[in-house]
């Protein structure tokens, strides 16, 4: 099961929200993020862990991750998650990390896709899509994503 493997990978990286899980061998954080982005129906709890990965591992292989995201048309998802991680870094006073994340966000901005999609649930109903379209953040709207994820939802993970 992709979700179980991903949860184990996130636990191995030290994600506090999954600290109760027995973790596997630690994987490359960039690979974990890409694996999650490629999952069509990603558990919301796992999607919420992704900004934490970017915030906690700002030295990951961004060149590889951005390239792989673009090849798979995932740059909007990565751009939005990078935006959320940057806003968390700013809130926490991690200015160097925020600056690095802003640079990655700017690089992703240049290849932003027009297509609207869900951050983690490709199987959303039309009613869910309408609700998210109305209630999403300006950042989610900018990245053409249907999600209500925001830094305020993630304080438990820090």
Where are these regions (language model features)?
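N-terminal leader/targeting peptides and immediately adjacent processing regions
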Residues: 1-27, 157
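Charge-dense, extended regions
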Residues: 95-158
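Mid-protein regulatory/catalytic core that forms ligand/cofactor-binding pockets
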Residues: 16-110
